Amino acid sequence: MALVTVSRSPPASGHSTPVGPTQDRVVRRRGRLQRRQSFAVLRGAVLGLQDGGDSNVASEADSEPMEEPSGEEQPTEDQTDKGQGLQSPWKQVQKRHLHLMVELLRPQDDIRLAAQLEAARPPRLRYLLVVSTGEELSEEAILLGVDFPDSSSHSCTLGLVLPLWSDTQVYLDGDGGFSVTSGGQSRIFKPVSIQTMWATLQVLHQACEVALGSGLVPGGSALAWATYYQEKLNSDQGCLNEWMAMSDLESFRPPNAEPGQASEQEKMEQAILAELWQVLDTSDLDSVTSKEIRQALELRLGCPLQQYRDFIDNQMLLLMAQQDRASRIFPHLYLGSEWNAANLEELQKNRVSHILNMAREIDNFFPERFTYYNVRVWDEESAQLLPHWKETHRFIEDARAQGTRVLVHCKMGVSRSAATVLAYAMKQYGWDLEQALIHVQELRPIVRPNHGFLRQLRTYQGILTASRQSHVWEQKVGVVSPEEPLAPEVSTPLPPLPPEPGGSGEVMVMGLEGSQETPKEELGLRPRINLRGVMRSISLLEPSESESTPEAGGLPEVFSSDEEPLHPFSQLSRAKGGQRVRKGPWPALKSRQSVVALHSAALVASRTRAFQEQGQGQEQSEPGMSSTPRLRKVMRQASVDDSREEDKA
């Protein structure tokens, strides 16, 4: 492990040094900006260390802010501990990358951790940064993703910005990877080693606990500084796609080939795919076999295709599934499956410009061609779709306003996407749930939202009804609601759409309660491992301190009777402005039972101590009385109880 110190100074200014009352504020500001940050460099990770007062040294020479003491190196250069001997190549590379990543930050922000991640396309390098700000004693943190074209590159780009809100959860995904979910966004990361993973999870756990204790929620002034980095996103589309990748996808878009670097295998697969359409169109699918399809392709291409048998079978199934076209529910809205979302020709033919992906396990196949909106949920009754329906309605309306069309899809186009289309119809056209379900099932008979989604649709129907009634009442009294009106924009029913070619002419209308059971789209997943639970289990393995019965006067301050109720952040104190400041190291989490027991013991001891003091005070004021302190304490408690009974009576 090596120690690296980076000197960070703001740009030189031509203004003179202020004098008078404002000088102290300027010096303090320079002390925050002109400082050095030290890092512990590990293989694959860089840990930020706490400043040990370097800011005071930097703020002393306020008349010459850019001047460095003799014997020290210039700003933005590093100083290693003992500074002797040749360093290994990986340390030199990490130090150079560290300098480049520091240059991406604002002067008041610090890197708490820089962890190297696995890259899907070497020689690219990826780093995950945990960045905190020094503004006003704030403990807010964000995650940044940094991309390097290769290890020798002298520049880097920003590909990810993820604020850490109070709802942040970290899950272990196996094989050294983990996912971070915050503010409705989920991102996956896979460090290059176990040591790097362990260092990263420790820093993430601390940042998540601070965010939870500070109550950081979207929509307020918290983490407003993250917009600075969101405006600086400049990685190429390939890097952005890698940061957006999901760990549990079952359907992937094909890899983006580098310009001019398509392999011979990819060229052959493209040729097979082009001919496969023609072969299937001219074959009797009820009698033809896979071997006969391959032999027909060999005749067309003039070469053996033994090594492409699995590719041909896979593409053949894909093409057959894509023959089930998406259902046109409204003139501007199609409802379909993942096969429809992967069929570029059909999407272009239907003039689709927006794709609403309601599946957790399906990737965005053409992010460079279409506008996507993702709602990452599973087809489970416990999944919550209702909070997303306002944004999905707005997304669909954006496509309609542009004169284009939107495809709403999930895995099979049966449950998640169908429920979202039903919610859209109820809000847009003022229909109730039964009317919307009849219309959608007429055009796509396989629609079957699960029971949990049906309950949410009924709740949504009540919300829309109440909103419309409230809107009408406000119009009667002449009050304009500041909220977005939920009244339908179009109240007239749509003309019936012609049935899709090749579709069934039967109308299958199912009741809400009597819908037939259909096979689930996905099997249930086993519970995910949460980082907070892992850290709690680790803390319980630590040897506990010797617990002896404390005396009344020797109780620790954390268990004082006048303190607020205990919470997991007992070492976070309130600073100016109501913000929390962390003091000292993070304590190990104790079991809830022991904390409750100790708190109860402390409360009893403190009350006993208070009774003793009151008893001693009365004994001094009434020296003629000969009762003992113990007897006096019992009598006082009895009198208090009697007075309470009299009050109740």
UniProtKB/Swiss-Prot annotation:
It holds the Pfam family DEK_C. The gene is Ssh3. Coiled coil: none annotated. It catalyses: O-phospho-L-tyrosyl-[protein] + H2O = L-tyrosyl-[protein] + phosphate; O-phospho-L-seryl-[protein] + H2O = L-seryl-[protein] + phosphate; O-phospho-L-threonyl-[protein] + H2O = L-threonyl-[protein] + phosphate. Tyrosine phosphatase activity has not been demonstrated for this protein to date. It is found in: Cytoplasm, Cytoskeleton; Nucleus. It comes from the Eukaryota. Residues 325-466 form the Tyrosine-protein phosphatase domain. The keyword Phosphoprotein applies. Residues 541-551, 608-627 have a biased composition (Low complexity). Its EC number is 3.1.3.16, 3.1.3.48. One of its GO terms (cellular component) is cytoplasm. Protein phosphatase which may play a role in the regulation of actin filament dynamics. Can dephosphorylate and activate the actin binding/depolymerizing factor cofilin, which subsequently binds to actin filaments and stimulates their disassembly. It is an enzyme of class 3 (hydrolase). The modification Phosphoserine is found at residues 9, 38, 88. Residues 61-78 have a biased composition (Acidic residues). Belongs to the protein-tyrosine phosphatase family. Disulfide bonds: none annotated. This is Protein phosphatase Slingshot homolog 3. GO terms for biological process: negative regulation of actin filament polymerization. Residues 1-32, 49-90, 541-586, 608-649 are annotated as: Disordered. PANTHER family: PROTEIN PHOSPHATASE SLINGSHOT HOMOLOG 3, SLINGSHOT PROTEIN PHOSPHATASE HOMOLOG. GO terms for molecular function: actin binding; protein serine/threonine phosphatase activity; protein tyrosine phosphatase activity. Keywords: Acetylation, Cytoplasm, Cytoskeleton, Hydrolase, Nucleus, Phosphoprotein, Protein phosphatase. The keyword Cytoplasm applies. Its main location: cytoplasm. Residues 1-20 have a biased composition (Polar residues).
